Amino acid sequence: MKYIIMQDVFFIVLLLVLAIPLGIYMYKVMIGERVFLSRVLEPVERFGYRLMGVSEAGMSAKRYAGSVLAFSAIGFVFVMAVLMLQGFLPLNPQGMKGLSFSLAFNTAASFVSNTNWQAYSGESTLSYFSQSVGLTVQNFVSAATGIAVLFAVIRGFIWKKQKTVGNFWQDLFRVTLYILLPLSLVLAILLVSQGVVQSFADYSVVETLENGAKQLIPLGPAASQIAIKQLGTNGGGFFGANSAFPFENPSSFTNLIEMLAILLIPVALVVMFGRAVKDSKQGRAIMTAMMIVFVVGIVAITISEQFAGPSYQGVATSGSMEGKEVRFGVGGSSLFAASTTAASNGAVNAMHDSLTPLGGLVPMFFMQLGEVIFGGVGSGLYGMIGFIILTVFIAGLLVGRTPEYLGKKIEPYDMKMVCLLILVPPLLTLFGTAFAVMMPSVQASVAASGAHGFSEVLYAFTSMGNNNGSAFAGFAADTTFTNMVGALMMLFARFIPLIAALYLAQNMAGKSPVAASSGTLSTKNGMFIGLLIGVVVLVGALSFLPALALGPIADFFTTFK
C-alpha cells in the first residue's frame, strides 16, 4: 500500500510541476501575446485566417454561440457521412462496411460533443480513414471548442462595459495551433517510442503457439489518436479495450504519461485562470477545492480495490484484480479510473464494470458532480465557475448582501444561466436512466441482474449525460434506443451549458467592477474552499443519492452475504 501512496503523490507533484508553466503559456495564447512558438506558427496563423476569411472582430454571445453550433453541425454531418460511407472510402484494408444510421448518429454526436462514448469496437468496425480523418479531427476541434468557450467566459470577468466575448474562429484556431497540435505531436512521438502502434499497414496474421492456429493482429494509426484523446479529454479508444490494450498503453511508463496527459490541460487551465484575473490566489483556491475532492476519490477507490470488501475478509490477496491489467495493478488502475472520470475523459485501463461496488461508485459520482473536478478541457472550469457563483450567491443570502465574484455583482439573470449550467446534466442523466430502465431493449442489454444491473444502466446514462464516455462494459450499448437517446443526451449536455456559459460571460463583460469592501466575501480563503466543496458535493448528493442507493450502494451490501 505504501508504494501505491508514493506513486499517487509522485503523480500529483509531477502533474503540478508540468501544469504551472503550461498554464502561463496558455494565458499568453489567450491574450494574443507572443510565445516561443510564435516565430514558426504566426505565418501559419495569418495564412489560416486569410484562407478562411476570418474577421478578428469581437462577437456577442449570440454570434459566438451560433458559430460554435454551426461549426459543430458541420463536423457532425461530416463524421456521419464518413462513418456511413467508409466502405467506399480509402484506407480501409480490412474492407469495413459503413455503419448503421443509429450507430453513425450516436458516434458523430459522441465525438462532436467531446464525449467519445463508443457503442462499437474500433478494430472490428472502423477503417483507418474513419479513425484518423473522421474521429481524430473531431478530437482536436471539440477540445479546442471547449477551451475557446472558457476563454470567452474568462473575458466576461476581466473585461468591463463590453458587449462582446471574443472571436470564436480566432480562439479556435489559436487553441488548436498553439496548444493542442504541439502537445499532441510531442506525446504521439513519445508513445511511439514506447511501442504504441502507428501504422497504415494491413492487419497482421500470425501463427500462435496453440497448434499453429492463426490470429489476426489489428494495427493502425493509433498513437496519433491516443495523444489527442488523452490531452483533449476525449477518451475514445482506437481499439475496443481502450488503454487496457497493450497497443495503446504497453507499460507502466506509458500509463503514467497517459494519466498526466488526461489531467494536464484541465489543471493548467486553472493556473491560467488565476493569471487572467490577475489574482493567482483565486486560481489556487479553485485548484485546492478540486484537488481535495480528487484525492479523496483516489483514496476511496484504492482502498476499496486493495482490500476488496467483506467477501475477501480473512483472505490474503493483492487486491481485487478482476478486470485489471497485471502490468498496472490496483494502484495504477485506481489512479487511472479516478483521473479519467474526474477529467471527463472516459478512457479506461481496467474494466470499470469489474470494480468493487464502492470502487465503481467513485468514478460514477465524479461524473455526477457535473465533471467539474478538473473536468473536460474548458468545460470543466466553466462548469466549476458556475458552482462558484452558486456558492457566492448562497453565501450572500446567508449574510444579506448582494453577492459578487471578482468584482462583478451576481444578478438574477446570471443565476438563471448558472442554473442551466449546473442542472441540465443531472436532469438528462436521471430522466435518461428512468426512461431506459422501462425499455425492454435496454433491459435485454444489461448483463447483470439486481443492483449491479441497475448500476450498469445508471453508469451508462451518467457517462453520456455528463460527456464522459466511459462505461460499465456489461451494458450492450449498440441498440437503436440507446444510440438515438444517448446521442441527443450527449448533444444537449454539451451545448446547453455551453450556451448558458457564453450568455453568462456576456452579461458579466457588460458590468463595471465594484470595489471590494469589508463585507465582501473572500473567494480565496479556506472557508470559501470548504463552502465550495460542500456545494458541489451537496448538489451531486441531492441529485443522485436515491439512484446511487438503488445501484452501487445496494450492490455493496450484497457483498455481506
From Swiss-Prot:
GO cellular component, one term: plasma membrane
SS bond list: none
Database matches in InterPro entries: KdpA
MF terms (GO), sorted A to Z: P-type potassium transmembrane transporter activity; potassium ion binding
Domain of life: Bacteria
Membrane spanning stretches: 4-24, 65-85, 134-154, 177-197, 253-273, 285-305, 380-400, 417-437, 484-504, 528-548
Membrane-related topology note: Multi-pass membrane protein
A Pfam family per the record: KdpA
Location in the cell: Cell membrane
Main location: membrane
UniProt KW keywords: Cell membrane, Ion transport, Membrane, Potassium, Potassium transport, Transmembrane, Transmembrane helix, Transport
Family, similarity comment: Belongs to the KdpA family.
Subunit structure of this chain's protein: The system is composed of three essential subunits: KdpA, KdpB and KdpC.
Role played: Part of the high-affinity ATP-driven potassium transport (or Kdp) system, which catalyzes the hydrolysis of ATP coupled with the electrogenic transport of potassium into the cytoplasm. This subunit binds the extracellular potassium ions and delivers the ions to the membrane domain of KdpB through an intramembrane tunnel.
Listed name of the protein: Potassium-transporting ATPase potassium-binding subunit
Gene: kdpA
